[in-house]
Amino acid sequence: QRESVCELGIAVVEDGQVTETRSWRICPTPNWFHPGNIRVHGITVHDVAESPKFDTMWTEAKPYFEHANVVAHNASFDMSCLRHVLSKYDLAFPSLSYTCSLQVARRAWNGFRSYGLGSLSQHFGINLRHHAAESDAAACAQILIRACQEHVVSDFSEIGSTFGLRMGKLYYGGYEAAGKLRKDGKTCSAVATTGRVPG
């Protein structure tokens, strides 16, 4: 259930440097965890029992997302979770642009056996506590910074043209999924409305 978010982590990047990291534990509704998910992230029902619900936490986290350029590793999944949980609580989507560090990495470096966050972090000597949201966010940021430095990308707006990607967008009432640029210059993407827009 993609609306069942139990932790949110961010890393703020300014002038090519990570300047701030934060995370929030969240008590999902209902507060139940599949054993397989617990094995992945290590968070249990008891760990979040006293944590705020997403809508309460979002008042603190939203300013980091509004009018921001956002990056996630396997962004299609993370952004889907964000859309689902915002819709669950009838919260408006923030206005943001996003891209995927996984897709950037695949285009920035050839020949890696795996482009997962753990493998890339190990290869580049990035300290990572995998599946801890704050650490994942910081590692994702550092991977994108490295890719941009090596390919002389100086601005977020240049990522799409450099790596053959279309930026995704969230906005009030809908979203445009990130996509790959085709050889004919067109994009493979989806545009949708939420169907649940707060009044």
Per-range role (PLM):
Residues 95-105:
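A short, structured active-site edge motif that brings together acidic residues
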Residues 1-96, 110-131:
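Conserved non-catalytic scaffold segment of RNase H-like nuclease domains
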Residues 133-147:
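Acidic, divalent-metal-coordinating active-site segment for phosphoryl/phosphodiester hydrolysis
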